[in-house]
Structure formats: structure tokens, C-alpha cells
């Protein structure tokens, strides 16, 4: 009652409280039952309208004048959380658990309380699991359990997620949420057949543009480039800033990617990040057979490097994105990442896996004389952090994990990372010497080997044909369809090393050291 400011408090509710708080215990039972029911319903109406303090005043009346029913304790607890009294709320839920005789209802109420009100997801899992031991008929509860395991334990709980989502699927096989969950979980679990089954069920169940895009990405990750890139075209129909068509629709002249344009000028525009441009620019020369002329627009930081790489630029007009597309004459345009669809590329027909970008030897030599140390030591370039704005995370490695490499004898370790602070004095920072990607390429060409988890450096090193160890998390970006063997499929010079557990690199770095030791032998 100390919370009440009578000037601001609802006079109607205060009058009800004052009128009935003096009611005698010996009042007729029928009167008390009717009154308590009315008060209880009134309190719930107030709560539904988020009028919490007034509702608690009425519950106080019930506490004083009647014996609360179990539902009262849980209702009070849930709404104490809303006025920032979680400790008191938990006390009421403890009392509720002793009062509620219906075990199924009790476990569900406790589970929902800890899940939705407190955010103690581990406790929520405990009570939901007790619930499904008794009632095995609710698909939504199994689905909640699958999602909670994902939220609390991440990819280490894939088996539990699949177990509960499969239970939900058996009870409700048309639930799009469950189908999505199973497709994603099986994809993460490397069970491509099962993932494909559920993706196909999604596409037969009121599919959206993002469903087609997700399926396309999945197929690409499986190495099914032809079908994957067909569905991948749906990305531009999704409301996602990272997936926008690279040319403004108000003046774009989109090619449908199939009609004859042999007598036309085709403008190919980069999309997404630097790594994507490095990876996909290899397709530009092959597009010459489709159009009379090809114009290739790239990010300004990449312009000099690509312009001066003959495999890509011979017979191609390469332009910086500083040039407004409005001022370029052309007939049709397309996005760079659609090139594999146009070319019907397969994993065995990826062009130029040996490399296709070049820098002039004198520039490479000049860079070395300026910035590199003992030339007789093994020169190792490292990149350990990905773009924070990219669609995919999981590419960051604590720089301290590279100490096992910097402690090796007769090595010089160079950071190729831009804008990072390096505390290890054994790591030489080259990032602040990079004005554009020609500088980065010169640094990479001077390395005996590059070790990278960052897509930009990984793709650039591969495109330059430099020996590289690609460090891949357990969950990788869909473009990397091959993460075993001696190369990644895209580049002959890039050897993949993959974590067995997401974000756990303990098995990867010993492999790195073993490979580096071969260079000393």
C-alpha cells in the first residue's frame, strides 16, 4: 500500500478496496465467493491493460481476505517481474509449485515463467522437459525446446535440437517454423540428404523469396552450383540491405540472364564485399562470349589491381565505382554473383583455380625492400578477423592463438589485418601500409605462406596463387563448398583446415604448425 499515491491512483479501485477490506470473515460464503471472483477478474483485466499497481492492490485484498488459488500465485509472480521485482516473483512461483495439484499445468506454467518472464532458459528447458514426459501431444512445446537448446547451447546442441524438432514435425508436419528449424539443423549437422528433404518440403509449403534464396545457398554449399545459383537469384527479392541489387532500380536495365545479347553492351556490377569481388571476378572473361562488349564495375580500392590483371581485364572495360552508372552507356546490366548461373558453372568447371590476379614484379620487390625484415626467414602472413558487417560471423580468432606460430624459430609473422591493435611484438603489422588492394597484393606476394580466416585475404591470396592455409570454422559461409582435402575447389593454392567444434581452434593450430614445419625441413 506504500506504493499508492491516492492523487494518481484509480479512485474506482481504491474505493473498491476500501469498501471491502473491512468485510468480516463471517460474511456468507456465497457473498465471499462472488466477491472474490469479481475482484480476481477485475485484477486480471487491469493486468491485461498493464495497470499493475492497482491490480496488486486488489490481489492484496485477496491475500488478506481469502485463500489464494494456485493461479493467483503464478499471475502475481508474472506481473511482479513487470514492475522489476523478479526475486519476489520467484518466491511466489515457489509457493505456486507447492499449491498446484495439476502437474502438467504446473510444469508448463513454471516453464513459461522462466522462459518468457525471467529469461532463465536453462530452468525453462528443465520444466518443459518435465512437461513433455507427461504430455507428448503438443508440437509447440517440442518446438520451443528445440529453439531453447539452440539459444542456450548453440551448435553444440544440434542433436538435441534435431530430436525435439523431429518430435514437433511428427505432430505438425506442415509447420513452416519446424520445417525451417529442421532444414537448418540438419544442414549444420552436415546431413545434406535430410536438410534437402526439409528444404524441399518448405518449397512446397507457401514458400517465400527467402526460402528460395536459402535453398540456393544450401545447394551451393553442397556443390550443386547449377541448381544453387538458379535459386540464388531470389536474393534481390528479399528485403535485406546486404542483398540489394547493386544498381538502382530507377535506371537499371536488368538482363534476364538468358536472352540473346550478343550485339549488346553488358555492364557487370560488383555486389556485396571485397571478398566476393575477388572470388567471382574470375568469371568476367568468360562472359565475353555472351555480349559484344563487357563493362566491369568494381570497388575503387580494387580498381588498380583488377585493371592491371590481364586475365581479367584483357578485352574488358574495367571501371571504378567512383564512376556513376548513370553516366555509362550500356544496354543491359547484371550482378556479378549471377555469373555462375549464366555460365552454367559446376564445381569442376570453375575457371582459373590456379590464380588470375597479378601485380608487377618490380612493385612486389619495392614493397619488400620497404617493409619486410629478414628475408631468409619463413615469411608468414596472417589474417584473423572478418568483416563485422558481413552476413556471416564466426571468422574471428583471438590473436593470442597465433603465439604458437610466432614462437617458432626462423619465422617472421606479418599481420595483413587492417585497423587492428597488435600487442605481440613478434607480429609485424603491415595493415597500416595498405593504401589500396594493390599494396595488399604486394604484401601477400612476398609471403611464403598466408594463414587466414578472413574471406577477403583468403580470396585475394588464392586469386594471386599464393600458398595459403584457409582456417574455417565448423559452420562456414555457403560459398566454401569444399573444406577438406588439399584445396578448397575455388583455388588450387588454398588448403582448408576446419574446426571440429564451432569457435574451437584447438585442433586446427597444431595442424598449422605441422604444415609450417615442412617448410623448415
Residue spans for each PLM region:
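Alpha-helical solenoid repeat scaffolds of the TPR/TPR-like class and their adjacent stem/linker regions
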Residues: 1-449, 454-521
